[in-house]
């Protein structure tokens, strides 16, 4: 049976990602990355993340999710989709698919349990994809926007990162 992820904002500061391995509870850093937090919360509230999967799992590094294209069984496009939940000045205001988040770098380090925004080579290209560090990754500091942390469920993150995966680090089964 397929297990779909469903992200639900419980209150102002906590979100829950439900997976077949259990729940991951996230706390947000509104003070250091307000636009990233706002975009993530809006996506969670409007169902954007419902049915998405963790499409990239790298042991000793991180798990990545938040791509709306992972709702499809076609893995070839997994990891290529997603945009900001509203217009933050990057992209074309009348074309939602082009909306990106401006970088909000801080002194917060990428340690185990940190929630950060995935992006392309362009620092101002964050959209909806996020990752959770399973180990310290200080080489990402000041290059990727940290916007929260896991407050409960790191054992779930550890189970996800250990899942069998293909050559593209996409889990064999939907998570």
Residue ranges and their predicted role:
Residues 1-175:
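Cyclophilin-like peptidyl-prolyl cis-trans isomerases
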């Amino acid at each position: 049976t397929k297990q779909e992820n469903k992200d639900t904002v419980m209150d102002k500061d906590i979100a829950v990602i439900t997976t077949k391995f259990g729940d991951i509870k996230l706390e947000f850093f509104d003070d250091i990355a307000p636009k990233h937090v706002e975009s993530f919360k809006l996506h969670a509230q409007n169902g954007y993340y419902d049915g998405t999967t963790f499409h990239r799992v790298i042991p000793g590094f991180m798990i990545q999710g938040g791509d709306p294209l992972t709702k499809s069984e076609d893995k070839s496009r997994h990891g290529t989709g997603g945009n900001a939940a509203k217009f933050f000045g990057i992209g074309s205001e009348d074309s939602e698919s082009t909306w990106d988040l401006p970088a909000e770098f801080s002194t917060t380090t990428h340690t185990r349990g940190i929630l950060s925004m995935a992006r392309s080579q362009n620092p101002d290209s964050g959209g909806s994809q996020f990752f959770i560090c399973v180990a310290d990754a200080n080489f990402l500091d000041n290059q990727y926007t940290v916007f929260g942390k896991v407050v409960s469920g790191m054992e779930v993150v550890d189970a996800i990162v250990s899942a069998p995966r293909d050559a593209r680090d996409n889990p064999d089964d939907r998570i």
